[in-house]
């Protein structure tokens, strides 16, 4: 194996990977929806608080009108913080706009709508109670705001905003629900305080649900659609099972999810953004994936609560509604939550991606530009791999020098490839040429290349981040194809500096000639940040290789003169 062959293999692996990602796209414009599934609890599982066995479809609503509080039409409350604008009714967050993330870079662009009450593609977060022993519970419209007709806005001198709702039953049981928002945070604390002023025990359990109808844009894969490359679906985490996920298009494979988990969390992911329910630490919950009509549901159901007369209790959970910001996610101190930034389902590749992002973020804090941070990353990687690269370039320079002799050997032995190979290996041994010298530096770049691709696709910090001039968003393709064209030129020039092995198969030689064009076309569809990485990396490689060849040539001429003397 030689350097040229390794480069050919690397190129084909890259192209094959991208074609594989594109091959899996959904051909249909609509998602085939399975019927609602009824999921039961495995009987052998036991928890400190038993989780009831009920269906995983629509949220149960009590039918005993004598036990359910009156259900007047509840007004929708508007809440605005420095990062979120929401509509909520006490039972659900119906809509959520991310104020710091416009849909485009156009002036006056509207913010991203993560949760939405769009009737075609609704997406909401809901929490409520399910009765046991005929205890009264609030239904979809019985949480009333403590102050009606009021909109809430986080003032400039406030760091926290509390939005309270209340439900009261005829038998004296009441629940006060508060939504607590903090400045700069996307995690919302939702707390229920249950007080039993009646004469009979109150029994119920809490559920927390994410429900959405996926839009076709995230289901149909295409090389020109970065949203479709990013993982879209449900993910969950537990101490025992670790990080697990299920794509929307495979939502009910293997019978959905029906598992009791202590602690953990459950979330719905899309490109750059996610929602997640995070229960109290170590609280045992039943985790469910289900479908109800066209809706995909991710739900957790908490333990049953019994509140005796004259007693009170409290339960709370966090709801994340926002971007995949690594720094903010880390501050939540929730184990495994950083995996929502889904660099890869494979742990090793995910770790490489996390390491690359850590370097990029620190470079960005110094250079104040993500594009220059990518350039800086390339420089650091080239420095780190220079000892390996030096051996590669030295081997290439030697092979270039002895190329005429290899051609003579080829002409001498003609069609006898076995004798030619033996003579070639003897020459390599005599002149201390390592034909494998260029393999390892190229192979070691492969996981870095693919990990960086996912870093650029997944990192919301780079969304709409400019570099300079025509590159105004590093996560989208080069609009004028300048970087892909530069990549073609650099690869062509590198090929001219790299000696073609004398015994190389003619077909492989022709493939190597068109490889710059293939790579250039491929780079036209990848994020411009990745194309920038490849152009800078290739440019530095070309300069170093040119310098090493001339250095070796000067060294060889000097040794020849010394030998003559």
UniProtKB/Swiss-Prot annotation:
GO terms for cellular component: plasma membrane. Keywords: Cell inner membrane, Cell membrane, Chaperone, Membrane, Protein transport, Transmembrane, Transmembrane helix, Transport. It comes from the Bacteria. Gene3D superfamilies: 2.70.98.90. InterPro entries: Membr_insert_YidC, Membr_insert_YidC_N, YidC/ALB3/OXA1/COX18, YidC/Oxa/ALB_C, YidC_ALB_C, YidC_periplasmic_sf. The chain crosses the membrane at residues 6-26, 348-368, 370-390, 437-457, 479-499, 516-536. One of its GO terms (molecular function) is membrane insertase activity. One of its GO terms (biological process) is protein transport. It is a multi-pass membrane protein. Pfam families: 60KD_IMP (PF02096), YidC_periplas (PF14849). It is found in: Cell inner membrane. Required for the insertion and/or proper folding and/or complex formation of integral membrane proteins into the membrane. Involved in integration of membrane proteins that insert both dependently and independently of the Sec translocase complex, as well as at least some lipoproteins. Aids folding of multispanning membrane proteins. Interacts with the Sec translocase complex via SecD. Specifically interacts with transmembrane segments of nascent integral membrane proteins during membrane integration. Belongs to the OXA1/ALB3/YidC family. Type 1 subfamily. This is Membrane protein insertase YidC. It comes from Xylella fastidiosa (strain M12). The lineage of its organism: Bacteria, Pseudomonadati, Pseudomonadota, Gammaproteobacteria, Lysobacterales.
């Amino acid at each position: 194996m030689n350097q040229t062959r390794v480069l050919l293999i690397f190129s084909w692996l890259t192209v094959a990977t991208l074609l594989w990602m594109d091959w899996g796209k959904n051909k249909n414009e609509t998602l085939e929806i399975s019927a609602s599934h009824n999921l039961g609890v495995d009987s052998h599982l036991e928890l400190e608080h038993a989780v009831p066995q009920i269906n995983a479809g629509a949220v149960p609503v009590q039918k005993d009108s004598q036990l359910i509080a009156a259900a007047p039409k509840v007004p929708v409350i508007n809440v605005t913080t420095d990062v979120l604008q929401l509509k909520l009714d006490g039972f659900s967050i119906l809509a959520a706009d991310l104020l710091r993330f416009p849909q485009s870079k156009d002036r006056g662009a509207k913010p991203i709508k993560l949760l939405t009450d769009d009737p075609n593609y609704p997406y909401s977060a809901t929490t409520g109670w399910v009765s046991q022993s005929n205890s009264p519970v609030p239904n979809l419209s019985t949480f009333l705001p403590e102050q009606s007709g009021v909109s809430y806005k986080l003032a400039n001198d406030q760091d926290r905003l509390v939005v309270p709702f209340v439900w009261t039953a005829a038998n004296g049981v009441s629940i006060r629900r508060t939504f607590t928002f903090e400045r700069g945070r996307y995690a919302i604390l939702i707390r229920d305080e249950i007080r039993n002023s009646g004469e009979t025990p109150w029994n119920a359990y809490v559920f927390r649900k994410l429900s959405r109808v996926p839009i076709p844009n995230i289901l149909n894969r295409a090389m020109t659609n970065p949203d479709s490359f990013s993982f879209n679906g449900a993910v969950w985490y537990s101490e025992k099972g670790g990080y697990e996920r299920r794509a929307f298009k495979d939502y009910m494979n293997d019978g959905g999810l029906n598992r009791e988990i202590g602690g953990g969390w459950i979330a719905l992911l899309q490109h750059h953004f996610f929602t997640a329910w995070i229960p109290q630490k170590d609280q045992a919950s039943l985790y469910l994936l289900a479908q109800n009509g066209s809706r995909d549901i991710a739900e957790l159901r908490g333990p049953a609560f019994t509140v005796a007369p004259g007693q009170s209790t409290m339960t709370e959970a966090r709801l994340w509604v926002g971007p995949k910001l690594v720094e903010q996610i880390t501050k939540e101190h929730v184990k495994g939550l950083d995996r929502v930034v889904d660099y890869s389902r494979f742990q090793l590749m995910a770790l490489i991606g996390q390491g690359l992002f850590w370097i990029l973020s620190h470079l960005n804090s110094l250079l104040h530009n993500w594009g220059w941070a990518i350039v800086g990353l390339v420089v650091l990687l080239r420095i780190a791999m220079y000892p390996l690269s030096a051996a590669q370039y030295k081997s290439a320079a030697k092979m270039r020098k002895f190329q005429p002799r290899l051609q003579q050997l080829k002409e001498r032995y003609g069609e006898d490839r076995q004798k030619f190979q033996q003579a070639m290996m003897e020459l390599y041994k005599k002149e201390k040429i390592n034909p494998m010298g260029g393999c390892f530096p190229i192979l070691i770049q492969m996981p870095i290349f693919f990990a960086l691709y996912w870093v650029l696709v997944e990192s919301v910090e780079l969304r709409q981040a400019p570099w300079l001039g025509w590159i105004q968003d590093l996560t989208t393709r080069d609009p004028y194809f300048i970087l892909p064209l530069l990549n073609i030129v650099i690869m062509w020039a590198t090929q001219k500096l790299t000696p073609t092995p004398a015994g190389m198969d003619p077909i492989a030689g022709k493939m190597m000639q068109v490889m710059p064009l293939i790579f250039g076309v491929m780079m036209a569809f990848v994020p411009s940040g990745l194309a920038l990485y490849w152009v800078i990396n290739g440019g530095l490689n070309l300069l170093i290789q040119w310098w090493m060849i001339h250095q070796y040539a000067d060294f060889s001429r000097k040794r020849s003169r010394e030998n003559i003397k």
